[in-house]
């Protein structure tokens, strides 16, 4: 495919050390690339070099002539003196921009709830972020670079954005570079994943699920990779393969290999044992919301109404809802910081509740202390999976380096503060744990470690998040706040999205517009679909036979006289031919599978 943008032998270093050393990467027509890695390893820096915002100390960035590159970084670039409308479409007359289906789609999908004439200076940080993203998407770009675009978006907005990107930067059309900690979004959008680590950029085929599979295979083969990190990713892979087998488009030949890889991985959670422990710690009564409604002083509108929810011991519940729907108010009722206007909240006598909020205000009091001093005041050990861990070991498990223990709390990055905050909450030994947007300021490795920690936590868990991957991973049931009411979602997040679409259609609200730039592909007939399925089955059988032949060829190589270089060369050539046949069949399998989607 045609080259669009790239970097050749890029080198960048700061006084604190080398960030990238001789890195070569490229973006071709149709690439949708997700960039992952630990916070601080250089993801945003890489994006800055490729978009021209940061100049490398050595190497060069190449661009196709006339290439249009748009980027969204994490700085606020809006002019507070402008209105929302000006920030989005400038001085273009309304009849001009309103007649553009793409502009209507972007405005409806991201900022329909923000008045066009509102001054930017009156907006919240989340609203300003959405305006920035919408203004970028309204423009015309060949390559677009997005740094954490899902920040401040609710689940509907994230789902809309994924659909918009896939339609607009489709296969063989333009290029996308994406940094995100939202693993569902990454898996939905990316066709290639770059992992930034140890001053290099390592490419992987596919989205997040395929990246996890390949990373596990890499880690198993590389003896230098630490066992702890490998086990975490194998556990993550186990959930991906058991809980959502459609997440990766690998053919059955590869899926069988993945299943063999995780055959000895135990279930993520022993739900029976965790429920028993939770009941022992909590008793049968936890928190009951009985016919609860909340209206704030001076307002006739009820934020929540007629809420009836009995929270049981050991339940793991996810809460979803649009921004402003009342999720924080619901958490306030559970925590006791919000008083209901009517109804009552009944709390069990043994309940010890801790909440991980978005402010991390509890760290302000210890801002001048070193991390080791803070954890030195805590209990000496914490048990996970039957093992006793010290607070320092627990922090390491959450991605803290030992040399960071001497850092003062006030000097920690946002992600480091989040790690420390989570550890302090867990070590306070609550039996009811509430997590309010726990994915803010953390990378995918930290999220995986957090999920691993929560797997062995035996209390009642309530999670409010726009990160559907996290919700589906750590909770067993989901509820939504819709029109001020709490509704159970037996079908999970997908059911919530269907309900919001139905409500938008029935009320005629300014919901995300239907994209009309391209006509949908014509549906295939039943006979054509059967022919595709038949060919896929044939390929599966051929791949299975080739796998046996490849295994046999490896055995022949191992048993052959190692001094017979001619014979070894012949066997190796035969092996390469078999592997080439596998690659061709897998490529055809992928083409056919897309026809069935």
Regions found by a protein language model. Name each.
Residues 1-224, 278-597:
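ABC ATP-binding cassette signature C-motif
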Residues 214-257, 261-265:
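Intracellular alpha-helical coupling/juxtamembrane segments of multi-pass membrane proteins
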Residues 236-245, 273-279, 287-288:
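Alpha-helical coupling/stalk and coiled-coil linker elements that connect catalytic or binding modules
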Residues 268-270:
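Flexible, solvent-exposed coil segments and beta strand-coil junctions
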